[in-house]
């Protein structure tokens, strides 16, 4: 199954999803596809018209361009996902969590899709980390 991870560039969540036999949907792969695209002259600085249109599908024109840009990458992944893992309250250095508007929109899009999802709190010590990994493992095994 295809599992969207939030934050979308979390290597920890990416690895867990892969270890339990699922396909992680992450921003790393989406960005790689953009960089390999010959339409983009100076990756990753340029956007195509298609990117702008994709972003407008998920957020209106009055929404900051950074939010629309992120959603132009993440929105299609959420639409493709069969399930989702959401890390709650991570520190700013855990993936790309600096834009709260983007984060809220991602959670809304996942909820609106109605796909199976799990929200786990970011662990602050070893015990919590083990419990978090256990919750994610149980969720992923239940998807098979």
Can you annotate each of these PLM segments?
Residues 1-144:
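An N-terminal assembly and electron-transfer interface module characteristic of large anaerobic redox
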């Amino acid at each position: 199954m295809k599992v969207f991870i939030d934050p979308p560039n979390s290597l920890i969540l990416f690895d867990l999803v892969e270890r339990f036999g699922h396909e992680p949907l992450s921003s790393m792969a989406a960005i790689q596809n953009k960089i390999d695209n010959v339409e983009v002259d100076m990756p990753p600085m340029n956007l195509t018209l298609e990117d702008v249109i994709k972003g407008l599908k998920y957020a209106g024109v009055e929404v900051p361009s950074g939010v629309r840009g992120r959603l132009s990458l993440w929105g299609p992944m959420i639409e493709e996902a069969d399930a989702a893992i959401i890390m709650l309250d991570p520190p700013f250095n855990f993936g790309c969590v600096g834009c709260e508007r983007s984060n809220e929109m991602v959670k809304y899009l996942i909820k609106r899709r109605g796909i199976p999802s799990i929200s786990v709190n970011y662990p602050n010590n070893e015990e919590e980390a083990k419990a978090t990994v256990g919750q994610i493992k149980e969720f992923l095994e239940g998807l098979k």
